[in-house]
Amino acid sequence: PQPIIRVVQQINENVVFTAPSMSQRAALYALQHREEVQPALVETFRERMFFAAACINRIPKMHVSYPPKGSFYLFINIKKTGLTSEEVAARILQEAHVLMLPGNAFGACGEGYLRMACTVDKAVIEEAFARIGRMAPFGK
């Protein structure tokens, strides 16, 4: 119904397109003080990325190039599973409760990969890959 669609659109616009004032102030502070803020953030995300890569490479049928290069995203090779990236992403979400994007969301060349953001604490990354490692076709 149209009235519900209008309300949902308004909520979506406010959530997606309008950053809360607290977030705007935090972003402004980070930009104004980037010399003191940035190095610690870069190191934190680098540590998480290397930690996640090590966790991934211990799981059969999953692989990430080492050492990882780039930002806090990893592209995980899952071709040895014999499943599509959408199938693996859906199973991981359903069975391990870990969200990853199927590689084909980035085009045909992304098929056979999953994209993971290393933006959570290392303990969360470790738990996520422990759960994934217990799943068939990875660990069972």
What are these regions (language model features)?
Residues 1, 32, 77-79, 119-121:
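Residue-level recognition of strand-loop junctions within catalytic nucleotide-signaling folds
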Residues 24, 28, 43-53, 65-78, ...:
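Conserved glycine-rich beta-strand-loop-beta hairpin in the small C-terminal domain of fold type I
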Residues 12, 48-49, 115, 131:
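Short, cationic motifs built from Arg/Lys/His that form the positively charged side of catalytic pockets
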Residues 53, 61-65, 99-104:
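A short linear hydrophobic-aromatic micro-motif
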Residues 82-87, 91-100, 106-140:
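PLP-dependent enzyme catalytic core of the Aspartate aminotransferase-like
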Residues 56, 76, 116-118:
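Preference for bulky hydrophobic residues occupying beta-strand positions
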Residues 1-46, 53-55, 136:
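Conserved core segment of the aminotransferase class I/II
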